[in-house]
């Protein structure tokens, strides 16, 4: 069966690569694995061997039929659905597992949506392993003063320890995509989350500050509080130069700035 371009389907079949990807997961057998976009089941085949429970979410009815014909495992559940429309928290609540991880050969066209959906339930997860476009993987794992550093980099760092695992050459897929991919892992923790009262508001705060990377942090902060003098006062309090641009602040500075702004009556 041919890959469907509108679903962003690119398949892998190399057994060594499959094992290497699955190896990135925590290898504790007693856990729930949620696989997003299993396609023809290349990763699924290895996952059902290693873990107690595997739930796969596949939007394509044709792929679901292939999966049902290929697998007859009592530890596998196949769900046909658009993952962006599923309540993952409700899905997870059906199972009694302390360790829960997500793995996905992520369709390029919905990468950000899947990442942010995963981050929203980070408190329920142990780890997530994603195959992404190499450029996006580098962005997620980047730090301040790096060209591709943005609000997605900070969001992933806020909820997890980010690791750039390895590059996957585009020739390992069929059909061959235009760019190389990479595997990243997110190991979830609450180190930064404990430092603020509203994580969703923080993520939105950072997103707005990155809306225009060419403007200074002062101008972008002014877009939020609508008071340039007050914005300058906040930055001076934290010894943050008003001439810096969004990519020149690290996550600790963003957390301090958020806490200062939202504990004041701006």
Swiss-Prot record:
Name the record gives this protein: Ribosomal RNA small subunit methyltransferase A
Catalyzed chemical reaction(s): adenosine(1518)/adenosine(1519) in 16S rRNA + 4 S-adenosyl-L-methionine = N(6)-dimethyladenosine(1518)/N(6)-dimethyladenosine(1519) in 16S rRNA + 4 S-adenosyl-L-homocysteine + 4 H(+)
Main function: Specifically dimethylates two adjacent adenosines (A1518 and A1519) in the loop of a conserved hairpin near the 3'-end of 16S rRNA in the 30S particle. May play a critical role in biogenesis of 30S subunits.
Subcellular location field: Cytoplasm
Keywords: Cytoplasm, Methyltransferase, RNA-binding, rRNA processing, S-adenosyl-L-methionine, Transferase
Uppermost EC category: transferase
Pfam families assigned to the protein according to its UniProt record, in alphabetical order: RrnaAD
EC number: 2.1.1.182
